[in-house]
Design a protein with these regions (language model features):
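C-terminal functional segments of enzyme domains
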Residues: 11-16, 73-160
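RNase H-like nuclease fold core
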Residues: 1-46, 58, 159
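Flexible, glycine- and charge-enriched loops at secondary-structure boundaries
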Residues: 41-49, 87-91
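Short glycine-rich phosphate-binding loop at a beta-alpha junction
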Residues: 65-74
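Feature targets compositionally biased, intrinsically disordered low-complexity regions
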Residues: 26, 31, 37, 63, ...
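Short amphipathic alpha-helices and their capping/turn segments at secondary-structure boundaries
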Residues: 55-65
Length: 160
């Protein structure tokens, strides 16, 4: 069955937030987000690959995913260029893991779009809104406490 993975990234001076949505003709099948924290939070290429790999794992865990179209946000265009071998990867071992994870699917193709408000499909807008909401929540006191709790107990959404 054909699925589409939308992935987006937003960031500020302290951290970055990633969000993804996996859809098919029935609607949204999976969604999630990740937040950078720790010593690698400002290393965009490394955290981009880690978020991409986690989103691919979530997509491959769904039953019936055979064909996957991966739609990158404009902020992840460097990752897209690495994946189609236009640019040389900064971290070859992490790049190889990303390539290996795409091999879980019968076929896959890459696409890129600029998630803006003109001409965007609902999934593109939704994934961008999710990433912006997660980043916005990290700016509040309650959000920072939740981020600390997630760093300690729910490490699945933290990229460190």
């Amino acid at each position: 069955m054909k699925h589409t993975l939308y992935i987006a990234k937003v960031g500020d001076e302290k951290r970055a937030a990633y969000a993804y949505i996996v859809t098919n003709y029935e609607g949204i099948q999976a969604a999630g987000h990740f937040i950078t924290a720790g010593k690698h939070r400002h290393d965009g290429q490394m955290t981009d690959h880690i978020a991409f790999q986690r989103a691919l794992r979530a997509a491959s865990a769904l039953a019936g995913v055979v064909d996957l179209t991966i739609v990158f946000d404009h902020s992840l265009i460097d990752l897209a260029f690495e994946m189609v071998a236009v640019e040389r990867p900064k971290y070859p071992s992490i790049y190889q893991n990303s390539v290996r994870l795409t091999g879980r699917f019968h076929s896959y193709e890459f696409a890129s779009t600029d998630f803006n408000e003109t001409g965007a499909c609902p999934e593109e807008v939704s994934v961008m809104d999710d990433a912006m909401e997660v980043l916005g929540n990290c700016r509040t006191f309650k959000g920072r406490l939740l981020l600390l709790k997630n760093c300690l107990f729910n490490n699945k959404i933290i990229i460190s």
